[in-house]
């Protein structure tokens, strides 16, 4: 099975398209596919989603970190979203033919490459020494809290030879994690204080919805107030049920959700439960989703055809040039990689 790793790096630039384009260009020269680029001027942040073979993804992320180092200066950066680095957060996700342990090894190699640029690195998520460690404690106080030295209890895993954050690029949090749902909800009819109370009520950290992280933010450039949310453990949760619970808190306080947006990509497996609720399907069956079945069919055909070619090349022996035989052996090795549990795309 062909291994596919997803990367969802967050960069502290959401207003200058030329800088974001330069970052995306640095990623695109590698053998990866860029799936989405989301820029937000209020957050002053961009999220790039791309997939590829782990080695290509690793190289693309280190090159993107170098462009961010050259083009982003946190000393003049101000946005409503917390940040500690030019390349702020760098998660990788095993989406096909990989175990989480493979993603952790990729994250470690990426972090080492970023540290070689002179940027200190913290591990988080499954890549942390204590797997599952979150981002919130690392980002407390933002970039400014690291400028004068390492805060108590927050020493980077890779200090890059420094005793404080890089003066312009800060630090980078590198992690491995399962798929999550990142989405924002625009709220009308409430003030900032009321929305902050709702964020406190719904997030897991304060005893709310399991797996949910939430921030109440003012977004003046786009107008209004926003709940910025991440839902973790989505394979075991119904995002639509989470939305209804969040909406219930907002309406109970006298407001309403005017619209929402997804940041990055959303798997079919997360859309289906919402459709089931809204359409009141009597026999919900995810296997009947056409897009998922077509994807599976195309992938099976591709792997079958590739296996046929590889077997022919390896069986032909000396009749085939040595470099082609070497490539076939490499592909044969990749094809034996075990699939990851809970695969999503």
Predicted region positions:
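Long, contiguous binding/interaction regions
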Residues: 1-341
């Amino acid at each position: 099975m062909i291994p596919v790793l997803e990367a969802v790096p967050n960069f502290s630039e959401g207003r200058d398209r030329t800088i974001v384009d330069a970052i995306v260009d640095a990623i695109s020269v590698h053998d990866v596919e860029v799936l989405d680029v989301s820029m937000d001027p209020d957050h002053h942040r961009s999220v790039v989603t791309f997939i590829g073979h782990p080695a290509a993804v690793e190289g693309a992320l280190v090159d993107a970190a170098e462009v961010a180092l050259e083009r982003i200066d946190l000393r003049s950066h101000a946005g409503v979203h917390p940040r500690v680095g030019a390349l702020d957060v760098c998660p990788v996700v095993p989406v096909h033919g990989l175990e989480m342990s493979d993603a952790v090894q990729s994250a470690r190699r990426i972090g080492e490459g970023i540290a070689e640029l002179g940027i200190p690195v913290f591990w988080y998520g499954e890549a942390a020494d204590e797997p599952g460690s979150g981002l919130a404690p690392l980002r407390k106080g933002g970039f400014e809290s690291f400028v004068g030295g390492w805060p108590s209890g927050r020493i980077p895993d890779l200090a890059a030879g420094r005793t404080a954050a890089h003066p312009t690029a800060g630090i980078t949090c590198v992690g491995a994690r399962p798929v999550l749902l990142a989405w924002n909800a625009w709220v009308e009819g409430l003030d900032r204080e009321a929305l902050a109370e709702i964020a406190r009520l719904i997030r897991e950290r304060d005893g709310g919805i399991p797996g949910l992280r939430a921030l109440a933010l003012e977004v003046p450039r786009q107008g209004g107030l926003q709940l910025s949310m991440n839902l973790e453990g989505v394979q075991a949760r119904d995002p639509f049920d989470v939305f209804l619970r969040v909406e219930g808190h907002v309406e109970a306080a006298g407001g309403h959700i005017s619209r929402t947006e997804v940041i990055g990509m959303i798997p079919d497996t997360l859309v289906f439960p919402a459709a089931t609720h809204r359409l009141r399907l009597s026999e919900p069956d995810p296997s009947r989703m056409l897009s998922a079945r077509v994807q599976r069919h195309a992938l099976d055909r591709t792997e079958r055809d590739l296996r046929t070619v590889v077997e022919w090349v390896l069986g032909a022996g000396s009749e085939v040039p040595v470099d082609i035989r070497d490539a076939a052996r490499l592909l044969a090795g990749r094809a034996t990689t075990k699939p990851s549990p809970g695969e999503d795309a």
